């Protein structure tokens, strides 16, 4: 499955809309990084909509630790968790993973976990709980692809301390806006010298499986209500 997710800026300079694509089965799991105002959440909602459209019977779990109005359209949905409910959301997804791993669940429709503001969530709980939550995330990043499960983590900074040893298992990296030197080094280490400091809101860089650095632009969502509808359906499954 190949999902068109971002516009390639090189082609846009010639007036050509060519999409950079993501193949989750080949490059599992994603980290989306960007400061406040970079367009990170706008892109994340677009990505969820694309997944819901392209992956038949996809089930999405959304953990929104920010608890602002960005995901208010999901209020009342079966697998929507806000603020401290996010702990239950992660556990729900982790149990679904364990059910597939143990053979209890034989289904293989795509299941997706989106966790907004993972680092802020970890900083809100005590050390013992942090270690337990990071262990779950590490297991998901390392093992869940085989069971058609994907993890999408949104952060302002992708410090290794928030991912235990499994950050490199996220194969789709999207950095929006002008990332700090530290974030470029952490996520785009081999290409940081090629990243220009001219990124505006909704523009950035994409890396797939550690290669093919691409300057990208987030497409405009032409029908927000349609996007909300397909995402709601997936979060309610």
Enumerate the predicted regions with their spans.
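P-loop NTPase catalytic phosphate-binding loop
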Residues: 1-112, 119-178, 188, 196-197, ...
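AAA+ P-loop ATPase catalytic core
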Residues: 118, 206-209
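Short gly/pro/ser/thr-enriched loop/turn and capping motifs at secondary-structure boundaries
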Residues: 180-184
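Conserved C-terminal "switch" segment of AAA+ ATPases
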Residues: 192-206
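Short, mixed charged/polar active-site loops
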Residues: 211-215
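Short, charged phosphate-coordinating catalytic segments
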Residues: 220, 224
């Amino acid at each position: 499955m190949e999902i068109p997710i971002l516009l390639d800026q090189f082609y846009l300079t010639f007036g050509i809309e060519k999409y950079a694509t993501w193949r989750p089965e080949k490059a599992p799991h994603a980290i989306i990084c960007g400061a406040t105002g970079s367009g990170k959440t706008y892109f994340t909602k677009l990505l969820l909509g694309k997944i819901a459209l392209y992956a038949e019977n996809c089930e999405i779990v959304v953990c929104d630790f920010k608890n602002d109005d960005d995901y208010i359209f999901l209020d009342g949905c079966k697998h929507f968790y806000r603020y401290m409910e996010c702990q239950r959301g992660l556990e729900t997804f982790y149990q679904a993973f364990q059910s597939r791993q143990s053979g209890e669940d034989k289904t293989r429709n795509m299941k997706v976990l989106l966790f907004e503001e993972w680092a802020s969530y970890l900083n809100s709980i005590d050390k013992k709980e942090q270690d337990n939550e990071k262990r779950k995330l590490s297991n998901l990043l390392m093992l869940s692809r085989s069971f058609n499960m994907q993890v999408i983590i949104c952060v302002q900074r992708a410090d290794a301390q928030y991912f235990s040893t499994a950050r490199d298992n996220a194969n789709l990296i999207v950095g929006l806006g002008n990332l700090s030197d530290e974030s470029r080094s952490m996520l785009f280490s081999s290409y940081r010298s090629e990243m220009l400091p001219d990124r505006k809101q909704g523009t950035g860089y994409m890396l797939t499986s550690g290669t093919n650095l691409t300057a990208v632009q987030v497409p405009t969502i032409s029908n927000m209500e349609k996007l909300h509808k397909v995402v709601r359906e997936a979060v309610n499954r």
